[in-house]
């Protein structure tokens, strides 16, 4: 960062300049994913005395920045001008917009409560393991978590970005967040009517209603709720009748200020075989990507799970699991459960060697999928260097750094020894590989942008 102090007594353009420097610092420090989630749409408004006023696009983003990042932003402003004593973050509503408040369902809809079609209890469909308290938050899922929390805590008002659309790969926490919303509402506002179900079950209930001539009851059931959560919406792709019913249900709920939460394995724009009008509406609200887990997040998930289970696991075993089981949270927790169960049944201590033996089939599966050659090709392509540079000894930073990253990924994603990895990189010895891995690990401690880049490469390689 520049150490030049920029006077705020100059023309207004200087105020904007300071914010542009602060925004760049936020991008450099937190990385592209988090920056785009929270700061990219924040604008400088004005400076009043020693206070800088910023404008956030929504109350939700304003409140989250205030609670999590206000002090950091103030310190960055003060770095450029120490006359600044405080910051204020506001929102400016568009003309004609109002806060939507949910009214109680009409008596007509409430009267169907005893219908067989409507007899299921929301609590019976929720998993007791999936609450906000045991959801581990990290950079890859922070936006999704904050939005889900805001929906749950809305206390009768609709979350300002409706619907909330969560998307990401299998086992990354989307379903966990939807269950957590359901639990929170039932515990803190039990009079609100909530339905959570998979898109597949939604379709089957619709088909059953058609067969039993209970379509009116079906419509009333889903259109009278306060919160409707549909998991894995991609299931209705190519199913025209179900799409038609979902479309009208969606419109009715949104028009009546009811909350919708949708999950999917891809973004709305990437959905195929689904009507454009549905695709458009799914993107109306907040679209939150649940990214692949980082090493730090996997470590946090393991430590949280171990604490819940009240077991003792050696640190080297935890680090091994966090570095080797990178596909998704579900597989990570499954591997941990398998290691603990094996120890309980055999009365053998949990050691790194035992863990490697217990999980050898899973690790071999990963080995079959990813090779050192795969890593070299992907990294070379990503950094726009020649594949031959992976085998060379060129020390130019634009070549050496990608080569170090490729060595780090080879150690992380394959079971190859340092010596074997060295052979794949132009017959380099194991100390060269060790140095490269150590260098990347040191950079990852503070370089969030590099961390996200490596996580992206892992995601590409695993898919």
UniProtKB/Swiss-Prot annotation:
Keyword DNA-binding found: yes
Stretch list, region Domain II: 84-124
Record-level GO cellular component terms: cytoplasm; plasma membrane
InterPro entries found in the cross-reference section: AAA+_ATPase, Chromosome_initiator_DnaA, Chromosome_initiator_DnaA-like, Chromosome_initiator_DnaA_CS, DnaA_C, DnaA_dom, DnaA_N_dom, DnaA_N_sf
Gene Ontology process terms (BP): DNA replication initiation; regulation of DNA replication
Compartments, record wording: Cytoplasm
SUPFAM superfamilies listed in its UniProt record: P-loop containing nucleoside triphosphate hydrolases, TrpR-like
Residues that, per the record, bind ATP: 171, 173-175
Keyword Nucleotide-binding: yes
Chief location: cytoplasm
Region (Domain I, interacts with DnaA modulators): 1-84
Region (Domain IV, binds dsDNA): 344-463
Keywords attached to this entry: ATP-binding, Cytoplasm, DNA replication, DNA-binding, Lipid-binding, Nucleotide-binding
Top-level taxon: Bacteria
One GO molecular-function entry: ATP hydrolysis activity
Region (Domain III, AAA+ region) location: 125-343
SMART domains to which the protein is assigned, alphabetical: AAA, Bac_DnaA_C
Biological role: Plays an essential role in the initiation and regulation of chromosomal replication. ATP-DnaA binds to the origin of replication (oriC) to initiate formation of the DNA replication initiation complex once per cell cycle. Binds the DnaA box (a 9 base pair repeat at the origin) and separates the double-stranded (ds)DNA. Forms a right-handed helical filament on oriC DNA; dsDNA binds to the exterior of the filament while single-stranded (ss)DNA is stabiized in the filament's interior.
Subunit relationships: Oligomerizes as a right-handed, spiral filament on DNA at oriC.
Domain statement: Domain I is involved in oligomerization and binding regulators, domain II is flexibile and of varying length in different bacteria, domain III forms the AAA+ region, while domain IV binds dsDNA.
HAMAP family xrefs: DnaA_bact
Family according to the record: Belongs to the DnaA family.
Protein name: Chromosomal replication initiator protein DnaA
Originating organism: Rickettsia prowazekii (strain Madrid E)
């Amino acid at each position: 960062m520049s150490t030049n102090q920029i006077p705020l007594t100059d023309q207004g353009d200087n105020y904007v300049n300071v914010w542009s420097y602060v925004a760049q610092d936020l991008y450099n420090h937190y990385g592209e994913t988090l920056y785009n989630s929270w700061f990219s749409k924040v604008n400088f408004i004005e400076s009043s005395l020693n206070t800088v006023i910023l404008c956030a696009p929504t109350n939700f983003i304003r409140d989250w920045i205030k609670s999590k990042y206000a002090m950091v932003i103030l310190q960055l402003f003060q770095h450029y001008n120490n006359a600044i004593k405080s910051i204020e973050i506001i929102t400016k509503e568009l003309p004609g917009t109002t806060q939507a408040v949910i009214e109680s369902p009409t008596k007509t809809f409430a009267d169907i409560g005893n219908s067989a079609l409507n007899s299921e209890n929301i609590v019976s469909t929720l998993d007791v393991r999936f609450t906000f308290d045991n959801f581990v938050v990290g950079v890859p899922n922070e936006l999704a978590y904050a939005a889900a929390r805001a929906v749950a805590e809305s206390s009768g008002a609709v979350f300002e970005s409706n619907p909330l659309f969560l998307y990401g790969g299998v086992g990354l926490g989307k379903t966990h967040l939807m269950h957590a919303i359901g639990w929170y509402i039932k515990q803190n506002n039990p009079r609100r009517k909530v339905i959570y179900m998979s898109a597949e079950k939604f379709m089957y209930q619709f088909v059953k209603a058609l067969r039993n001539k209970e379509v009116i009851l079906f419509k009333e059931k889903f259109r009278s709720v306060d919160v409707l959560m549909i998991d894995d919406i991609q299931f209705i792709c190519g199913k025209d009748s179900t799409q038609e019913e979902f479309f009208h249900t969606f419109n009715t709920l949104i028009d009546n200020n009811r909350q919708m939460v949708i999950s999917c394995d891809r973004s709305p724009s990437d959905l195929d075989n689904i009507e454009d009008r549905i695709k458009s509406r799914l993107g109306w609200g907040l679209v939150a990507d649940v990214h692949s887990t980082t090493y730090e997040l996997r470590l946090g998930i393991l430590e949280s799970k171990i604490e819940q289970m009240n077991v003792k696991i050696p640190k080297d075993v935890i680090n091994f699991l966090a570095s080797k089981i990178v596909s998704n949270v579900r597989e990570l927790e499954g591997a941990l459960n398998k290691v603990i169960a094996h120890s309980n049944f055999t009365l053998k201590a949990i050691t790194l060697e035992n863990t490697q033996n217990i999980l050898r089939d899973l690790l071999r599966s990963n080995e079959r999928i990813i090779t050192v050659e795969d890593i070299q090709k992907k990294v070379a392509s990503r950094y726009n260097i020649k594949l031959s540079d992976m085998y060379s000894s060129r020390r130019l930073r634009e070549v050496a750094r990608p080569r170090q990253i490729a060595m780090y990924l080879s150690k992380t994603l394959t079971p190859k020894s340092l010596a074997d990895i060295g052979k794949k990189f132009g017959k380099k010895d194991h100390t060269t590989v060790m140095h490269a891995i150590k260098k990347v690990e040191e950079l990852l401690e503070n370089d969030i942008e590099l961390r996200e880049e490596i996580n992206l490469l892992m995601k590409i390689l695993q898919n």
